[in-house]
Amino acid sequence: MSEFVTVARPYAKAAFDFAVEHQNVDRWQDMLAFAAEVTKNEQMAEMLSGALAPETLAASFIAVCGEQLDTSGQNLIKVMAENGRLRVLPDVLEQFEHLRALSEATAEVEVTSANELSEEQLAKITAAMEKRLSRKVKLNCKIDKSVMAGVIIRAGDMVIDGSVRGRLQRLSDVLQS
């Protein structure tokens, strides 16, 4: 998988630089997200692993994407098809999002809770994480009933486990040692 990231990085960098230059980063992220989803389609995955000519593959891919891709997005697809790299579009999207987060000094923070959190709770978590990470944060909230109560917060390789499940697990570990 790291090979895909290595292959995807230059495409993501080129797309990001182009998007910044033309002030349409949101549009490019949407195009890449759509194209990445298309590659996950079972029929498209078969086409990508088949022996189609690059021009045919690019034309088919662009036809499936329809108006979701502008001319520049179509050009990226053509270049990637010529180089046999359409399979790495999900990794291109991931790298693009990473570059965007770095440029905007934002961090993706995943918050997992047993129940939906109130706006006030989300605001407190956002403020605390912005202070701790020294950057703006974007919360992605998930609900997982196995958490029982409390929250688990993940930001990059940092995990803050304030869940009842986590506390019970730590208590169990202490009692077993």
UniProtKB/Swiss-Prot annotation:
Question: Could you tell me where this protein is found in the cell?
Answer: Cell inner membrane
Q: Which PROSITE patterns match?
A: ATPASE_DELTA
* Membrane topology of this protein: Peripheral membrane protein
Q: Which UniProt keywords apply?
A: ATP synthesis, Cell inner membrane, Cell membrane, CF(1), Hydrogen ion transport, Ion transport, Membrane, Transport
- Is ATP-binding among this UniProt entry's keywords? no
What would you give as a GO molecular function for this chain, any one?
proton-transporting ATP synthase activity, rotational mechanism
Q: What is its main location?
A: membrane
- Give an example GO cellular component term for this record: plasma membrane
**Disulfide partners:** none
Q: How does it assemble?
A: F-type ATPases have 2 components, F(1) - the catalytic core - and F(0) - the membrane proton channel. F(1) has five subunits: alpha(3), beta(3), gamma(1), delta(1), epsilon(1). F(0) has three main subunits: a(1), b(2) and c(10-14). The alpha and beta chains form an alternating ring which encloses part of the gamma chain. F(1) is attached to F(0) by a central stalk formed by the gamma and epsilon chains, while a peripheral stalk is formed by the delta and b chains.
The family assignment reads:
Belongs to the ATPase delta chain family.
Q: Could you tell me what this protein does?
A: F(1)F(0) ATP synthase produces ATP from ADP in the presence of a proton or sodium gradient. F-type ATPases consist of two structural domains, F(1) containing the extramembraneous catalytic core and F(0) containing the membrane proton channel, linked together by a central stalk and a peripheral stalk. During catalysis, ATP synthesis in the catalytic domain of F(1) is coupled via a rotary mechanism of the central stalk subunits to proton translocation. This protein is part of the stalk that links CF(0) to CF(1). It either transmits conformational changes from CF(0) to CF(1) or is implicated in proton conduction.
Q: Which NCBIfam families match?
A: ATP_synt_delta, PRK05758.2-2, PRK05758.2-5
Name the chain's protein: ATP synthase subunit delta
Q: Which gene encodes it?
A: atpH
